[in-house]
């Protein structure tokens, strides 16, 4: 059994999917890219990131760009700018769509769980 980090009761997982371009290897495996955030809902900080691409280096780099970001305080514009300026993979636009979708789910969750 793999070791799993204890994120605590305030951490919630938000994921969104978007269609990948047809000309990249990940499309043959997944068809879509998933972008998932583990967000501490008390602080708004992204504690971990999941991206369903093939290359571990790519997944690790995208996580590096996003982990620690306060999505509650700062929104997603900075995340999108980082991906736009520092990630030049063919899946860039799909990842940005996934970020927007995961953020929308976070906002929806916050509205449903006020109080």
Label the predicted regions.
Residues 19-36, 41-115:
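Active-site- and interface-proximal helix/loop "cap" or "latch" segments in soluble metabolic
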